[in-house]
Design a protein with these regions (language model features):
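Active-site-proximal beta-strand elements of phosphoester/diester hydrolases
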Residues: 18-28, 151-161, 199
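Extended active-site neighborhood of metal-dependent phosphoesterases/phosphodiesterases
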Residues: 3-9, 70-192
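Active-site environment of divalent metal-dependent phosphoester hydrolases
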Residues: 30-32, 61-64, 96-108, 162-165, ...
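Active-site-proximal segments of metal-dependent phosphoesterases and phosphodiesterases across multiple
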Residues: 72-73, 191-215
Length: 215
């Protein structure tokens, strides 16, 4: 069974069996990046000392007016670099998914943004399978400390962008099929289902089914 498109470079558990993931969500900034945000990220990294950082979408706000004029490519790249640099300068591996605001309005394409992210040596994200919905669907194996066994896996799925009517999109059936293919590939390779986490920006619509109205 062949590995589905989107496999990223593997990471390893520490010898003591630990692996710490730090999630950074919705920084929603522009090239005029908040110094407080950048400082906060740096202090959080120093406090938590993660083995992997996962940005879970809306790193930038494509609707930001500072992107409306001038060189958008340059400004968006600057915004991404400002947010990611605290992670990269500490040589911490990181990956990301896109949110509904990253390529909205004055933003640039996800393909162009991926190039900026991939310019950082510690970026693990992959563009993913071009034949399915979304951009950047990928997965990361977490190996045993000796690198011999796949003990854990992280899936990262693009939950797509806002639709023209203003509603948020949802993960597609073909993306779910891709996930199942990767899951089954890992089972075939290891002999059992691999414990996993899945990161995406927009929650699945089914979450509404478990919500209850309260007084």
């Amino acid at each position: 069974m062949a590995s589905p498109i989107g496999k990223a470079k593997s990471l390893k558990f520490k010898k003591d069996g630990t692996f710490r993931i730090m999630q950074i969500a919705d920084t929603q900034d522009t090239n005029i990046t908040s110094k407080n945000t950048v400082e906060f990220i740096g202090k959080a990294l120093d406090s938590e000392n993660p083995d992997l950082v996962v940005f879970t979408g809306d790193q930038i706000k494509g609707y930001g007016l500072s992107f409306a004029t001038g060189n958008r490519d340059k400004k968006v790249a600057e915004a991404i670099r400002n947010i990611v640099t605290p992670v990269a300068e500490r040589n911490i591996p990181f990956t990301f998914v896109f949110g509904n605001h990253d390529d909205q309005a004055f933003g640039i394409s996800k393909e162009k943004q991926m190039i900026v992210y991939k310019s950082f040596p510690t970026c693990l994200a992959e563009p993913g399978d071009p034949s399915i919905s979304g951009y950047g669907n990928h997965y990361i194996n977490i190996l045993s400390s000796d690198g011999k066994k796949i003990l854990f896996n992280i899936y990262l799925i693009d939950s797509l962008s806002a639709s023209l009517d203003g509603h948020c999109s949802a993960v597609s059936e073909e993306q779910i099929a891709w996930y199942k293919s990767a899951r089954d590939y890992l089972k075939d390779k290891t002999g059992d289902y691999v414990p996993s986490l899945l990161f995406q920006h927009i929650p699945v619509p089914e979450m509404w089914n478990v919500l209850k109205e309260v007084p």
